[in-house]
């Protein structure tokens, strides 16, 4: 009984740490893209870069552009 509990808790901790590491990697990736200084202006496609301040990336079908 004790052995199976330890195994389950260890597995749960491993999964939790893996998820946290993946989300931290995504945050770092987004920060690097923003630090490069490139941003999409209004009406420009925003698939690979973030929109400039005050704009958000809005999609209609497969076409995504920056809008207010």
From Swiss-Prot:
CDD domains (alphabetical): Spider_toxin (cd12960)
GO molecular function, one term: ion channel inhibitor activity
Tissue specificity of this protein: Expressed by the venom gland.
GO CC annotation terms, alphabetical: extracellular region
Keyword Secreted: yes
Domain notes per entry: The presence of a 'disulfide through disulfide knot' structurally defines this protein as a knottin.
Family classification: Belongs to the neurotoxin 33 family.
Protein name: U4-agatoxin-Ao1a
Source species of the chain: Agelena orientalis
